[in-house]
């Protein structure tokens, strides 16, 4: 027994051998190193990938989330006037989880909702949600409420007594979600230029469509979730608001132009036939030294706040009878931007280009003369001048001043088809201008090619018939004729600014090419100045102000209908042009359409107000010219005098061939419209020309 106890004692006092101690030290060292490495790795992940893993964890947990909407950028005019903006509106959100969590919340909350929003909410609908949707935390009861409407409920909910306690603590389970609604302060102003948005802030037409990616931002999001301890936590990702664009349109000039278009339309509504004053009326003003669009307007137009409202043009009965296709066609007719998407035969405003081509190529000399006997012969047919008795001998300048078709046809023979078509291309006809607006028409198939053009086509092209262009093509080419020869890309954008007002980028004018020499440009400018002072365009002049320009009268296709498009292209001041203005009146509602006086009168009435606004001062002695005239030009002139004064090469019956480039396409509704951009406005009816 004693011996056994002695053995146990020896066993208890036995110590670890040295090699075992060494192993333990190594083991614990490795364990400590692993622990340090693990801690280091965790710290590294937290620093570099913390947000990623946080989102992963959140995605596995029970949570609610809501979108925090961005604010779409504004559209501002050149002076900073807001033309389009986004205003906050509010949705009423019902949280049935909270509302039904305590029976005492239900009646006070329902009563408060119905008293504050009697026209927006129905009691039976609210009670149905409470009975059937008790687990839902997000139910939209009403959308698009104003701040003032919402405040009535908020004040009731937060009202306190003298002790600072809530008077209505049992109003629960209701909150307000912020959204943004597009607002257009000037409603109809520049409607086809600005455009509008559809649901989800998607730009549908105009600048809203073209600059959709710039104006739009990125939605934020708020996540609410229960963590492992069942505590409610949330994380917020802030929205990124869209950038704003500043455009070259001047709201004041735009308003003047639109007011005068409306005045003209009213003056001739129900004149010859029941209907508007013209099928289309359009005006573009541009800065010839930059290509900036100063104003762009057309009729018919629409209210940007109610873009699908046709009541201005149709009765309720007519609208009700419309098929879906007819409704779309009617809407697209008012949404279209005539200045950009529509093509037409320009008429005599082409003549300065023919003269410039001849002078620039040396095929026409300044000293050349032409004899106008009233017509040119092409086989069995005669192409007449508007003065069938003939102008007699004409100089180059006189041919422009008198708008002599016969002289221009003779010039085209000297120029030849190859040079003529070459300069059509140099001036940009048949090509897109690249203007920053959607739906620009593609016109390559609407002008002649060298292998297709015949002598009669060259002759009629020389005075603006038998080829098609757009207004923006014509005015962009024209200002290169009078600014020294520089063709600037037409544009709307001036700069982009972020939500804090910082400039993101600035647009600089782009000089694309030289169309004519400065000497040719100076001659054309002089010829057109005399066309206003002593030629066919006198009625456009505002007494005391210098002005140059050219009239246009084009017979529309089909010729047998005897419809006309009349126009005037002008610039001022003569010595140092600050703007170019182009007025087009398509099918005026008058007995005798073939007179440019309608476009001249509209131009003059616009310029009366534009000159003082632009700080352009009188630079000539007053002579009393056009004194007392209104937009109809009736005062001081009878109709016969006006027609004689403004007979600018109007096209006589049967003098223009029926076949034109792209005629088949136009009949099938092709090429006379802008390309099919992904927007509602591109289903417009076929151009009738």
Model-derived segments and their meaning:
Residues 1-316, 418-425, 540-541, 559, ...:
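Periplasmic/cell-envelope proteins involved in peptidoglycan metabolism and beta-lactam response
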Residues 82-85, 90, 229-236, 249, ...:
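Beta-lactam-recognizing serine transpeptidase/beta-lactamase-like catalytic domain environment
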Residues 589:
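Hydrophobic alpha-helical positions that pack around
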């Amino acid at each position: 027994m004693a011996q056994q106890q002695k053995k146990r004692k020896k066993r208890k006092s036995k110590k670890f051998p040295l090699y075992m101690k060494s192993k333990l030290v190594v083991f614990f060292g490795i364990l400590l190193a692993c622990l340090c490495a693990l801690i280091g790795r965790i710290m590294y992940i937290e620093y570099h990938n913390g947000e990623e893993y946080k989102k992963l964890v959140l995605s596995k947990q029970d949570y609610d989330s809501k979108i925090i909407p961005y604010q779409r950028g504004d559209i501002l005019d050149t002076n900073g006037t807001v033309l389009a903006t986004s205003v906050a509106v509010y949705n009423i959100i019902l949280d049935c989880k909270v509302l039904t969590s305590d029976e005492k919340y239900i009646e006070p909350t329902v009563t408060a909702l119905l008293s504050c929003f009697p026209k927006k909410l129905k009691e039976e609908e609210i009670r149905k949600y409470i009975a059937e949707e008790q687990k839902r935390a997000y139910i939209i009861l009403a959308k698009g409420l104003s701040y003032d409407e919402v405040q009535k409920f908020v004040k009731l909910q937060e009202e306190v007594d003298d002790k600072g306690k809530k008077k209505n603590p049992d109003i629960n389970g209701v909150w307000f979600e912020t959204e943004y609604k597009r607002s257009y302060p000037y409603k109809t102003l520049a409607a086809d230029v600005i455009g509008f948005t559809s649901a989800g802030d998607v730009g549908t037409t105009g600048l809203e469509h073209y600059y959709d990616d710039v104006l739009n931002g990125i939605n934020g999001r708020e996540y609410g979730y229960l963590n492992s301890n069942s505590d409610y936590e949330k994380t917020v990702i802030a929205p990124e608001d869209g950038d704003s664009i500043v455009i070259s349109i001047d709201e004041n000039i735009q308003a003047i132009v639109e007011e005068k278009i409306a005045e003209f339309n009213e003056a001739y509504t129900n004149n010859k036939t029941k209907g508007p004053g013209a099928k289309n009326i359009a005006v573009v003003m541009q800065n010839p030294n930059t290509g900036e669009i100063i104003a762009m307007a057309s009729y018919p137009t629409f209210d940007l706040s109610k873009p699908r409202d046709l009541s201005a043009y149709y009765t309720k009965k007519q609208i009700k009878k419309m098929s879906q296709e007819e409704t779309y066609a009617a809407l697209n007719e008012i949404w279209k931007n005539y200045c950009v998407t529509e093509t037409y035969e320009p008429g005599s405003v082409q003549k300065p280009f023919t003269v410039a081509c001849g002078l620039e190529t040396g095929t026409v000399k300044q000293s050349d003369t032409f004899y106008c006997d009233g017509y040119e012969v092409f086989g069995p047919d005669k192409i007449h001048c508007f003065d069938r008795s003939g102008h007699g001998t004409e100089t180059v300048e006189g041919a422009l001043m008198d708008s002599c078709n016969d002289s221009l046809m003779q010039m085209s023979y000297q120029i030849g088809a190859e040079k003529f078509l070459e300069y059509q291309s140099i001036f940009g006809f048949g090509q897109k201008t690249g203007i920053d607006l959607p739906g620009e028409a593609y016109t390559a198939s609407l002008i002649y090619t060298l292998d297709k053009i015949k002598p009669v086509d060259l002759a009629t092209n020389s005075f603006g018939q038998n080829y098609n262009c757009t207004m923006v093509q014509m005015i962009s080419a024209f200002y290169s004729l009078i600014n020294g020869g520089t063709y600037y890309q037409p544009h709307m954008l001036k700069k982009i600014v972020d939500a804090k007002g910082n400039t993101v980028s600035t647009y600089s004018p782009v000089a694309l090419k030289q169309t004519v020499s400065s000497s040719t440009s100076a001659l054309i400018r002089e010829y057109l100045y005399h066309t206003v002072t002593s030629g066919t365009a006198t009625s456009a002049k505002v007494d005391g102000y210098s002005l140059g320009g050219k009239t246009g009268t084009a017979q529309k296709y089909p010729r047998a209908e005897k419809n006309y498009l009349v126009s005037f292209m002008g610039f001022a001041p003569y010595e140092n042009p600050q703007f170019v203005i182009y007025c087009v009146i398509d099918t005026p509602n008058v007995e005798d359409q073939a007179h440019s006086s309608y476009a001249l009168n509209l131009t003059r009435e616009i310029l009366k107000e534009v000159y003082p606004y632009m700080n352009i001062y009188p630079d000539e002695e007053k002579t009393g010219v056009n004194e007392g005239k209104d937009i109809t030009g009736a005062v001081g002139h009878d109709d016969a005098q006006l027609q004689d004064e403004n007979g600018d090469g109007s096209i006589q019956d049967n003098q223009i061939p029926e076949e034109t480039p792209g005629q088949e396409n136009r009949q099938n509704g092709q090429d006379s419209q802008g390309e099919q951009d992904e927007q509602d406005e591109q289903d417009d009816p076929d151009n009738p020309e």
